[in-house]
Every structure is written in structure tokens, then in C-alpha cells.
């Protein structure tokens, strides 16, 4: 697939910025360029760019508190945006579509022997209440792509990444920062020897640097072979939030007290995923270590 025929929505966000370094000849659009919630704007975008491949990163996102307070907005805004983009791509004859989901949309609770979660478990139960609206909107994006692939043979599929972090995160907006970035910012800004954190520190999380996700997306977008399957993008390790915070202190070389507020929500206790399909597609891929990634991001905070 030629780079100059690739359209990236959400192209000015965290993952999009890493993709700009990897496939610079693609077309990257942000919310200021086209309103993806407006079907006429979306149709105009496809008429202007005429892509053969779409990488759909654009989404309404927010932290736990924002998702809890506004589940309907996260459901409706993402449903409309995703439907507009996928339907128009299909109608315009786009041959490859890569939708980006998230492991946070997997079922809130499964049996212990169902972890790490494989892709076929995505609909085995409802998503966590703290991501209810967002979770179902992303699931329907995956269903839309599956239906087109199964009925037409087009290379439409979903990539399901675990938690992300990057030096391109929203450092200036506390409501949009990802967990690792918010943690490192609190560590750097601490003046009283304390780092206040939500929850208990017990939940388990898989973290990957956003550049690693971008590399995998770029390989899928430009490869000659069809992918034709959904797959998780995650590393093998699943440390606790406490362990991640301790690693953040080490990366920052600061001796501070981690103070968890157990009255605040934890979110899902665990959502570790299986990466067997990823390893089959790209057996030689190696993830950046959490230690090195934290150092990179801390130096940019």
C-alpha cells in the first residue's frame, strides 16, 4: 500500500504523531480539518483525499472521572464518528481499514482461567462501568469492521492495544493525560515529598509505548499481504499500578512517598491480554522496555 494513499484520522494525537515519523507521506487529519461527527464533512474528506487505506485513530477520549460523569456523550459521539468514517470508507471503495480499539473495552470480569484475554472474548461480558459508553462504542466499531470484512472480503480489521504512554501525550490537559504521563507529571511536580494517586495501586496493567503501536499500525498499513484478523497489541508483562509508580520514581531518580486514595475508583482489576496473534503476524517485533520508555517520557514532562 502506497503511503500517499493512506488517510489517518486523529492524526494530530499521540499515536498519530508517532505515525507521522514513520509514514510521513500519508495524510494526517485532526478535528480542526474535518468534523467527523458530520457525515457531509466526512464525505468531503474522502472526496478530497481519495485514500486506499484508512487508519482510524480519532475518538472522544477522557479519564475515569470524565467517563463516569458523561457516558452518553462518549457513547453517542464515538458511535456517530465511527459509523460516518467506516460507512463512507466502504461506500467509496477503500480496500483497507484499520480501526483502533482498546483493551479497556474487554469484559469487566472473567474467570481466572480466561486471562490473558484472547480476541474472541471481546463480547463475553459487558465492559467495566467506568468505561461503559466508550467501551460499547468501540466494540461496535469492531463489529462494523468485522461485518464488512466477513461479507465483502475487504481487509477491514481492528487492532486492540493495551494502555499507552508517550512523550506526545497531553501534558497540559490533566483530563486527557494517560495514566503513566499523569503519574510522571505528579512525580516531577511534587514539592512536599508525596505523590497522590487514585485507587489502591493493586490493579494490573499492560503498558506499551505509543511508538510501538504506531510501528505495528504502519506495518499493517503498508504491507502487501492482507491482515484480515483482529489482534491485541500488548507486551507480556502485567505489573500493578503500584509497581508502575515505583518504576516511575526510579526513572525520575526521586525518593518520594506514593500516597494512594482508596476512596477513588480503581477501574478494572485486571485486563491483561494475549499477544499470540500479534506474534504470529510479526514474530520479530520487540517492545520498548517500560524502564526505557518511562525515562524517555519523564525527560519530556
Range-by-range predicted roles:
Residues 20, 182, 189-301:
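C-terminal substrate-binding subdomain of Rossmann-fold SDR/epimerase-dehydratase oxidoreductases
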Residues 111-118, 143-219, 247-249:
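NAD(P)-dependent short-chain dehydrogenase/reductase
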Residues 79-85, 137-145:
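Conserved catalytic Lys-bearing alpha helix of Rossmann-like short-chain dehydrogenase/reductases
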Residues 24-45:
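Adenosine-cofactor binding site in Rossmann-like domains, unifying the SAM/SAH pocket
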Residues 40-79, 91, 108-109:
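NAD(P)H-binding glycine-rich loop region in Rossmannoid oxidoreductase-like domains
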Residues 133, 137, 176:
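Active-site helix of classical SDR
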Residues 83-131:
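Conserved Rossmann-fold NAD(P)-dependent oxidoreductase catalytic core, especially the SDR/UDP-sugar
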Residues 4-23:
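N-terminal Rossmann NAD(P)H-binding glycine-rich loop of SDR-like oxidoreductase domains
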Amino acid at each position: 500500500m502506497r503511503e500517499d494513499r493512506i488517510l489517518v484520522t486523529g492524526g494530530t494525537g499521540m499515536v498519530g504523531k508517532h505515525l507521522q515519523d514513520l509514514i510521513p507521506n500519508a495524510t494526517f487529519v485532526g478535528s480542526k480539518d474535518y468534523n467527523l461527527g458530520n457525515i457531509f464533512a466526512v464525505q468531503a474528506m474522502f472526496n478530497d483525499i481519495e485514500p486506499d487505506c484508512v487508519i482510524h485513530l480519532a475518538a472522544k477520549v477522557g479519564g475515569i472521572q470524565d467517563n463516569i460523569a458523561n457516558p452518553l456523550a462518549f457513547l453517542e459521539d464515538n458511535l456517530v464518528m465511527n459509523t460516518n468514517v467506516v460507512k463512507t470508507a466502504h461506500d467509496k471503495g477503500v480496500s483497507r481499514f484499520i480501526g483502533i480499539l482498546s483493551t479497556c473495552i474487554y469484559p469487566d470480569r472473567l474467570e481466572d482461567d480466561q486471562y490473558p484475554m484472547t480476541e474472541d472474548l471481546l463480547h463475553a461480558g459487558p465492559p467495566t462501568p467506568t468505561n461503559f459508553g466508550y467501551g460499547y462504542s468501540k466494540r461496535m466499531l469492531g463489529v462494523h469492521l468485522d461485518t464488512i470484512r466477513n461479507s465483502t472480503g475487504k481487509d477491514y480489521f481492528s487492532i486492540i492495544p493495551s494502555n499507552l504512554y508517550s512523550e506526545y501525550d497531553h501534558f497540559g490537559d490533566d483530563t486527557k493525560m494517560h495514566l503513566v504521563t499523569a503519574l510522571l507529571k505528579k512525580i516531577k511536580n511534587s514539592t512536599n515529598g508525596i505523590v497522590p494517586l487514585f485507587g489502591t495501586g493493586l490493579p494490573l496493567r499492560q503498558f506499551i509505548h505509543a511508538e510501538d503501536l504506531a510501528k505495528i499500525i504502519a506495518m499493517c498499513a503498508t504491507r502487501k499481504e492482507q491482515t484480515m484478523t483482529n489482534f491485541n497489541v500488548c507486551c507480556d508483562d502485567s505489573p500493578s499500578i503500584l509497581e508502575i509508580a515505583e518504576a516511575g520514581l526510579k526513572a525520575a531518580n526521586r525518593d518520594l512517598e506514593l500516597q494512594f486514595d482508596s476512596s477513588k475508583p480503581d477501574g478494572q482489576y485486571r485486563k491483561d491480554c494475549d499477544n499470540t496473534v500479534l506474534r504470529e503476524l510479526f514474530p520479530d517485533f520487540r517492545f520498548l522496555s517500560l524502564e526505557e520508555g518511562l525515562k524517555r517520557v519523564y525527560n519530556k514532562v
